[in-house]
Swiss-Prot record:
<keyword id="KW-0547">Nucleotide-binding</keyword>
<keyword id="KW-0961">Cell wall biogenesis/degradation</keyword>
<dbReference type="Pfam" id="PF01225">
    <property type="entry name" value="Mur_ligase"/>
</dbReference>
<protein>
    <recommendedName>
        <fullName>UDP-N-acetylmuramate--L-alanine ligase</fullName>
        <ecNumber>6.3.2.8</ecNumber>
    </recommendedName>
</protein>
<comment type="function">
    <text>Cell wall formation.</text>
</comment>
<keyword id="KW-0133">Cell shape</keyword>
<dbReference type="InterPro" id="IPR013221">
    <property type="entry name" value="Mur_ligase_cen"/>
</dbReference>
<feature type="binding site">
    <location>
        <begin position="122"/>
        <end position="128"/>
    </location>
    <ligand>
        <name>ATP</name>
    </ligand>
</feature>
<dbReference type="Pfam" id="PF02875">
    <property type="entry name" value="Mur_ligase_C"/>
</dbReference>
<comment type="similarity">
    <text>Belongs to the MurCDEF family.</text>
</comment>
<dbReference type="InterPro" id="IPR000713">
    <property type="entry name" value="Mur_ligase_N"/>
</dbReference>
<dbReference type="InterPro" id="IPR005758">
    <property type="entry name" value="UDP-N-AcMur_Ala_ligase_MurC"/>
</dbReference>
<dbReference type="Pfam" id="PF08245">
    <property type="entry name" value="Mur_ligase_M"/>
</dbReference>
<dbReference type="GO" id="GO:0008360">
    <property type="term" value="P:regulation of cell shape"/>
</dbReference>
<dbReference type="InterPro" id="IPR050061">
    <property type="entry name" value="MurCDEF_pg_biosynth"/>
</dbReference>
<dbReference type="InterPro" id="IPR004101">
    <property type="entry name" value="Mur_ligase_C"/>
</dbReference>
<dbReference type="InterPro" id="IPR036565">
    <property type="entry name" value="Mur-like_cat_sf"/>
</dbReference>
Amino acid sequence: MTAEQLPPELQRVHMVGIGGAGMAGIARILLDRGGLVSGSDAKESRGVHALRARGALIRIGHDASALDLLPGGVTSVITTHAAIPKTNPELVEARRRGVPVMLRPVVLAKLMDGRITVMVTGTHGKTTTTSMAIVALQHCGRDPSFAVGGELGEAGTNAHHGSGDYFVAEADESDGSLLEYTPHVAVVTNIEADHLDFYGSTEAYVGVFDAFVERLAPGGALVVCADDPGSAALAERSAELGIRVLRYGSAGHAGAALAATLVSWEQRGTGAVAQIQLAGEADPRSMRLSVPGRHMALNVLGALLAAIEVGAPVGEVLDGLAGFEGVRRRFELVGTAESVRVFDDYAHHPTEVRATLEAVRSVVRQSGSGRLLVVFQPHLYSRTKAFAAEFGSALDAADEVFVLDVYAAREQPLTGISGASVAEHVTVPVRYLRDFSAVAEVVAAAAGPGDVVVTMGAGDVTLLGPEIVAALRMRADRSEPGRPGVLQ
């Protein structure tokens, strides 16, 4: 595509905070469609380097003059209000010049215009389920455009401008921005109280999902997980409004009929096999997965129904999903050393922690020996305050837990809230580690052959996985006198 096929306001843009995952994804699509992109960010990153290689002009640091990086100026400035304050000098300068300032969700909605859109939302599992739907359509030769919150393993990116008629995207519910979209198919994985710092009440948080579903395009469909009470209730309310609802879930539901049923599921190593029943078919189908966890099998059903709804053949979809390799930071294998496997996971809500550790426990159990060690970093003071006890209970699925201090992100500290707030609710052996720089050595010293270590959280805990692997290898070097390259 050429710049003429972009809306005029998106042909020459400046992006404030361009290095963030969501913003970088938008930048990739704009560049691929022939747009001119400049941007700024607080620091260098892999995402910044990749965008420069694609032609974006990026400055580190924020200054009003950054709006002049593109010769001839810009037609709009794009930002994300969650991370960028209104006092940012580039935003102040844009307003002074009369340059329109648009939020990322508004831009994404413009990029989806004219496409058949599949959007996935929910408290948990939306990145993985979105990625599954993308892989399913890719395997069927549809080449969808997509924008997702995590890096898709198969594609090595979180955004793509495709040649097909489809656009698959994750709809973030954290700040109400999902109300910018009008999808043809909406998948809701689950609904459970979260982001109360923004919404103020559970009722307000739940209400945004109802408002989102009411924005479905005419003739659109809602796909929901009937196993989750929150999304099941949404399905009932939506059906009463005349919205077409497709439910998926486990066998044995006494409520409304399921469009896709998980009849059986069996963990096999880091994958699984399952039997599923589709409505209208006489016999169940076999389904293979390359990712662990029963919750992943349910996510597959959501992606499957979404793909079928836009015309993808069932058999081809299942073949594609069998090869789904996962999403970066979703139970991602970081490395192995000294017979210790180290994984990294993005889980940052008690329900996510519980589901992930249940899956990991199955992996540990099948290996025959070894323990499960979890390095957990609470994310946001408000979330830690609200769910400290629930986090402690979820972490009890591990054999040993290392709790770090809270990753503040956009928040200011709250008096009396720290990693200790979570650690005090853990009943298995637990250590509260305040010194981030010492964590890798402490965990490596605690791990033994056959153990599985999981670093967990939405913050910079992800940096520790490689450090733990390196510490384990250093331990191996020290234990082998005379090994080449090892100082004696």
